[in-house]
């Protein structure tokens, strides 16, 4: 069996100019980055402002196993499938982070015959966006410490600096550090830490900005610390929002690539869904909607994380209205939630028990009044009996379900799913967010935890309660909520599989992302700098004398 990278390397890519032609782009609408990549100019949105938007389809998933359930693969396969049946469809995806690429998950460009290419480039650096985001973020960090060293005119309280440094890598050693050691010439000694770039507020801002000037304004509004009188200090107080924005002048432009079947894909931004808001950029999604009849996008991890944030944060802030939600499920993941000892062996009992997880995610998505279609991402270990079992279960609940073979067959494996998505997207979608912004921070958090996570009670630490009051007193109480929690469970406890309910969910800390425009609630001891596993994927990656990469996935 060929690996994903072997399949990708055998693909005949079309030059990016030809892909751009399929979108009716002119030479002035994009800038080429080599033969197979391009940046799309922001001016395109103004050029197409009078063009009607296409339909918006969100792809999400049930609670995954550590290896993931193929959400990106189905997103890409569905896009290829729609194009195969004559529809103009474009995928709008996130860019992979180097952290999981070298960590436990490997590359994040889909799999099998449903991938985006050039796969190696996209997984490794791509067009430099994440480096630009890291640089802009760390410029702010450097200026904060320099300001303190140079006299601290703003009277920054060094114990109340809330802006960390970032690195696009899993590195647990950087979670808690001391900086400024070695004498006064090296600055002021203080405790600090790093977070992974994809959890950075600058990443979130890039993905939630509508223009370059909007980006600059949002960066300026980031609260990086509090002064000795506990007043908030913003990046614009350091007068460096313009400098940070200049580092992002190209990164803000969405990237154009292609699938293995040479259909257009727009890739931009990459916030994680467990420790950030988990969606690609507003700009990329809006461009795709103008350039296609069907935009297929995804949100990270399961529906309780990425999809909830897509629907309650991104759609609300961008004025987007999804027409259909595709919920990806795998038989192996359902058996995992049902307590199977070996998910690669037929186990109807475990599969049936695992339906509780599937049903909970379906129920959650239906709360937003958007049509839902279930896609079963087929694995070779799935048996006919298991497929029949899950099909009957969904049909008994009146849910459209489709067996997807996009890994093995590419777009051909998503023909049935494509037709079901077209049908669902043609139905009336009365999308509405889960909660009203005017509710208190506590009420909004409790609504998500009880409605989406099925918690019986939400317990707030004293630190969290104090910060909630502070945020409301500062006038930010009407912002949407971004809960950071484990992706391994619907709850805040990774050990609670399937569909736990009635438990107590713990909110440890509350943070304000004043630039991005949301409030972060940290649940269940989640951390924003992952670590590497005992044997990271990096150990399997190599390159030969001709520059050919192997082992990426």
Swiss-Prot record:
Any one Gene Ontology molecular-function term assigned to this protein's record: formate-tetrahydrofolate ligase activity
Signal peptide: none
Keyword ATP-binding found: yes
Pathway(s) of this molecule: One-carbon metabolism; tetrahydrofolate interconversion
CDD domains: FTHFS
PROSITE patterns documented for this protein: FTHFS_2
GO biological process, one term: tetrahydrofolate interconversion
Pfam family name, one: FTHFS
Keywords carried by this UniProt record: ATP-binding, Ligase, Nucleotide-binding, One-carbon metabolism
Positions annotated to bind ATP: 65-72
InterPro entries: Formate_THF_ligase (IPR000559), Formate_THF_ligase_CS (IPR020628), P-loop_NTPase (IPR027417)
Reactions accelerated catalytically: (6S)-5,6,7,8-tetrahydrofolate + formate + ATP = (6R)-10-formyltetrahydrofolate + ADP + phosphate
Disulphide-bonded residues: none
EC number(s) recorded for this UniProt protein: 6.3.4.3
NCBIfam families: PRK13505.1
Family according to the record: Belongs to the formate--tetrahydrofolate ligase family.
Full protein name: Formate--tetrahydrofolate ligase
Organism encoding this protein: Brachyspira hyodysenteriae (strain ATCC 49526 / WA1)
